[in-house]
């Protein structure tokens, strides 16, 4: 009986270790994917900013679908992690250029723009709340 329990315990521990390693590998893949998305968003924003010739204080409007970044149909695979990576990449580029980032919302929010308070005040935009 003790021997059987020992084998069972060993299998449970092995299973937990495998799950941990699998989870750790998946997390590392996610982090690598997030970094790649962040770099691509940064490079794309830099290229657009360079071509647009925006002056300091201008608005740079960005709108994208995290589902499409994931390779899925719009609205079918929303991802806060992807949104975070895209934002970080684009925001870094616009800050270096000295322009404001305005993020365009989806159709559920009537394509509203989300921007920093300083930019909204500069351009005289009305502040609203969404519930």
Residue ranges and their predicted role:
Residues 27-60, 80-92:
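N-terminal glycine-/serine-/threonine-rich phosphate-binding loop
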């Amino acid at each position: 009986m003790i021997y059987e329990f020992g084998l069972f315990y060993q299998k449970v521990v092995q299973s937990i270790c495998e799950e941990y390693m699998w989870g750790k590998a998946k997390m590392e893949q996610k982090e690598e994917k997030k970094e790649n998305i962040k770099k691509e968003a940064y490079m794309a924003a830099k290229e657009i900013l360079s071509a647009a010739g925006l002056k300091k204080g201008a608005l740079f409007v960005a709108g994208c679908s995290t589902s499409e970044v994931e390779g899925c149909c719009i609205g079918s695979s929303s991802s806060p992690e992807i949104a975070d990576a895209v934002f970080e990449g684009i925001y870094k580029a616009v800050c270096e250029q000295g322009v404001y980032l305005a993020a365009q919302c989806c159709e559920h929010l009537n394509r509203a723009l989300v921007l920093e308070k300083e930019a909204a005040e500069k351009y005289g935009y009305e502040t609203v709340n969404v519930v």
